[in-house]
């Protein structure tokens, strides 16, 4: 076979088979010997092609028109799905048997043939499945056959609305049973909702304090709060302008303020959460006008920077110095000016001892004249004092102990109080107010003799005298 064709022939590679008419893969002399060769071997040769009958088709001949394969493929839907499609496609959600046939043949060309077979299956499925309900025809609409529709409980028999998969075979009794079970489960929940609503309406909730009521505290209105009998009978200490001393004052003076302040503080502490405690309530109360005579809650009066037990705040006026019944009430200053000593350097100089009382009195007086006559915000950290005459200083045995507590450092740092801005004392954080209320009410010991007994660590110096102008009161 290799000797019968030329290797040097350009057509031997099979690239261009139809270059010449007299040359082919096989020589003409041997043409008759290869009549039995298969067609793929002779399709490139004119001489070999002529030896075969004309009915032999070429490999690349044109195809005759054939029907598309997709038209003849059976749809992947069951007969139940086909009937459901026809019913849901109708405007009235009901269709006759002939309408089902027409819908299926229009949508799926596969069912255009062999009508007898699949139409019989459609009728069987309509009769045997409970999901299809037969509806009699009305007399007003003449025609042949009855309508078929879907049972209302069978609309969800296909998964996610896809007709390719059905959940399960629909049965009317199962559907009714499921409906009853759902009704039993939903009944308690429906009954519980109205009862809960009635309980909410019958039990009035505690309404929080409105911001409008808080902001108009300066004289028009005050936030609604329950007034306890103790708060309604708050004693008022006489003006310090008079020469009467604290110990010889009214029966509601310093010796009796400890029990009164603690009791009222406890009651106010329990009443505070009912008002809707908020930061706005704190700040607006701190910014209260001196012309209003409102009481401060223990969380506001608590001296957060000194660790002293918070006491009951008293009424005040611009012409009277705010004298708060703090346990530290034995210090004495003979002055006629309105003074409120803050938690700064010259306030600590009150405890230097009896030998320096004269010098300290003049220093504190000159410094406090620059301060306002009233200061609500600074009273949270103030050390209240009683205005006793200088002649009564020596009669108090506590001055020696106070001098030993404060290490006689107040004389050296007393002059620093004038340069310390009072405005920096007016901004206390909310955390300090809460901490002072918690620590002050529970941990600070108070002596019945009105002596200032503050719990400081004995191993650390009380005050720093290394030239620091700011004293960290919240350190302790």
Curated annotation (Swiss-Prot):
Basic and acidic residues: bias regions: 173-188
Subcellular location per the Swiss-Prot or TrEMBL entry: Nucleus
GO cellular component: nucleus
Gene Ontology terms describing biological process: adrenal gland development; anatomical structure morphogenesis; blood vessel development; camera-type eye development; cartilage development; cell differentiation; cerebellum vasculature development; closure of optic fissure
PROSITE patterns: FORK_HEAD_1 (PS00657), FORK_HEAD_2 (PS00658), FORK_HEAD_3 (PS50039)
SMART domains referenced in this protein's UniProt entry, alphabetically: FH
Stretches with biased composition (Low complexity): 240-259
DNA-binding region positions on the chain: 74-168
Assembly notes: Monomer.
Function: DNA-binding transcriptional factor that plays a role in a broad range of cellular and developmental processes such as eye, bones, cardiovascular, kidney and skin development. Acts either as a transcriptional activator or repressor. Binds to the consensus binding site 5'-[G/C][A/T]AAA[T/C]AA[A/C]-3' in promoter of target genes. Upon DNA-binding, promotes DNA bending. Required for cell viability and resistance to oxidative stress in the eye. Promotes cell growth inhibition by stopping the cell cycle in the G1 phase through TGFB1-mediated signals.
Protein's name according to its UniProt entry: Forkhead box C1-A
Organism: Danio rerio
């Amino acid at each position: 076979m290799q000797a019968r064709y030329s290797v040097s022939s350009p057509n031997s590679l099979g690239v261009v088979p139809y270059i010449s008419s007299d040359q082919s893969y096989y020589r003409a002399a041997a043409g008759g010997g290869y009549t039995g060769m298969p067609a793929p071997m002779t399709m490139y040769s004119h001489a070999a092609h002529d030896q075969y009958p004309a009915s032999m088709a070429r490999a690349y001949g044109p195809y005759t028109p054939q029907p598309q394969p997709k038209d003849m493929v059976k749809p992947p839907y069951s007969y139940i799905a086909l009937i459901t499609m026809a019913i849901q496609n109708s405007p009235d959600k009901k269709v006759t048997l002939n309408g089902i046939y027409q819908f299926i043949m229009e949508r799926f060309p596969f069912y255009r043939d062999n009508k007898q077979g699949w139409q019989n299956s459609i009728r069987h499925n309509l009769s045997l499945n409970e999901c299809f309900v037969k509806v009699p025809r009305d007399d007003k609409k003449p025609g042949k056959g009855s309508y078929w529709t879907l049972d209302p409980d069978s609309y969800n028999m296909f998964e996610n609305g896809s007709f390719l998969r059905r959940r399960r075979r629909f049965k009317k009794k199962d559907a009714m049973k499921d409906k009853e079970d759902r009704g039993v489960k939903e009944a308690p929940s429906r009954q519980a909702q109205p009862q809960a609503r009635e309980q909410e309406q019958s039990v009035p909730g505690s309404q929080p304090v409105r911001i409008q009521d808080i902001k108009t505290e300066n004289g028009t209105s005050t936030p609604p709060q329950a007034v306890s009998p103790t708060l309604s009978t708050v004693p008022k200490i006489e003006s310090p302008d008079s020469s009467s001393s604290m110990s010889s004052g009214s029966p509601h003076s310093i010796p009796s303020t400890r029990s009164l302040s603690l009791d009222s503080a406890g009651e106010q502490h329990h009443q505070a959460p009912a008002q809707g405690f908020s930061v706005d309530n704190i700040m607006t109360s701190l910014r209260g006008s001196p012309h209003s005579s409102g009481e401060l809650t223990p969380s506001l009066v608590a001296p957060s920077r000194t660790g002293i037990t918070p006491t009951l705040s008293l009424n005040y006026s611009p012409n009277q110095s705010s004298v708060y019944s703090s346990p530290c009430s034995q210090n004495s200053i003979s002055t006629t000016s309105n003074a409120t000593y803050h938690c700064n350097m010259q306030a600590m100089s009150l405890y230097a001892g009896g030998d320096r009382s004269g010098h300290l009195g003049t220093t504190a007086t000159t410094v406090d004249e620059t301060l306002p006559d009233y200061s609500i915000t600074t009273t949270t950290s103030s050390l209240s004092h009683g205005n006793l005459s200088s002649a009564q200083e020596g009669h108090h045995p506590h001055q020696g102990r106070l001098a030993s507590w404060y290490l006689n450092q107040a004389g050296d740092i007393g002059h620093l109080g004038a340069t310390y801005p009072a405005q920096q004392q007016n901004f206390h954080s909310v955390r300090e107010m809460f901490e002072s209320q918690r620590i002050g009410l529970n941990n600070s010991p108070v002596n019945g003799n009105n002596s200032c007994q503050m719990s400081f660590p004995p191993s650390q110096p009380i005050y720093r005298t290394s030239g620091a102008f700011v004293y960290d009161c919240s350190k302790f």
